[in-house]
C-alpha cells in the first residue's frame, strides 16, 4: 500500500502516558516510525520540547538517528530543532553526521520557539535569552553554509580567512526546512528560498495569510527553484467517530492543561480521563479537539484532502494524537498506529 495525494508524513512528540517509562515511550515511537515506513509515508520528524512529563521528544537528532536505523526508506529528521537553543555549528555537525548515517534521508526542520518555559530556556542558552533569537535568520544562513561542501568562511580579526565545515567529506547534505506559524516565518522562508511548514497543529490562526506571503514573496534558490509547502495537523482516526473521540480525550485534556496553566502530567489513559470528568477542563479539551481531525476513516480522509486542496500544500504532516487504554502494551501505541493505517487505507481507496 502506498500513499498517493496528498503526500503524508509523520510528526512525533513521543508522548508519555501514566506508568510508562521514557524507554517504553521511545520504543513505541520507533515502532510507529516503522509503520509509517511500511505505509509509504514520506518522512518522520521529531519535535523539540523540554521538561514536560507527557513528552519525551527532547533531542530530535538523537531520535532521528534511532529512527533512521529502525527504518529502511522513510526520510527522518527534526520538526523541529529550536535553533535559539543551540549553536549553529553544533546543529550543522549533528545533521551532517545524520546524513552520513542515512544518506539522502535526512531533514533539518528549524524553528525559533523556545520549546519550554523561561527557566529551561535560560538553562539551554549560554549566550542570553534574547540574543540567539535576534540572530535567528543569520544562524539559518550559517547552518546552510556549514552543511555545504565548501563550508563557511570566517574573517578573523587578524584578517585571516578561517574555513569551517560540519563534516570532513560530505557526499550529500540534509534538506533544510523552516517551521513557523506566523507571517514572520513565512516571509523568512521565502527570502531564504527554503521549504516552509506551517505549524497548524498548534491551532494558530493565519494559515492562509502565511502561505500567501510565502508564495508571493518567494525567492528561488538553487535547491528549491519553486516554493514548497507543508501543513501539520493533529489527527485521531478510529473505526468509528465515537471511538476516535474517546481516543482523542487524553491528549486533548493534556493540551488544555498546558494552555490553562494547570500542572502538567503524564498523559492519562482513556479510562482515567473518562472516570474523572472536569467540566472546565473537558470544555477546554473539547475546544482543542475541535481544531483537530477526529473521525472515522472515510470522513477523516475527506477532510485531509479538502484541507490540502484548499490551501494547495504539497504535503500534510500528521501528528497522531490517539491515547491508549490501560491494558495496551507500554512499548507500543496501538491507537496512533491505527490512525496511520486507517487513514492511509482510506486515502488510497478514495
Give the predicted meaning of each segment.
Residues 4-22, 84-151, 196, 335:
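Flexible, glycine-rich active-site loops centered on histidine and acidic residues
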Residues 12-27, 79-89, 170-180, 238, ...:
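Active-site mouth loops of central-metabolism enzymes
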Residues 43-63, 82, 202, 320-332:
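Glycine-rich, proline-tolerant flexible connector loops at the mouths of alpha/beta enzymes
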Residues 2-4, 37-38, 65-73, 95, ...:
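Acidic (Asp/Glu)-rich catalytic clusters
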Residues 2-4, 129-165, 206-314:
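An alpha-helical appendage that flanks or caps ligand/catalytic pockets
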Residues 8-12, 44-46, 76-79, 106-110, ...:
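Hydrophobic faces of well-ordered beta-strands that scaffold small-molecule active sites
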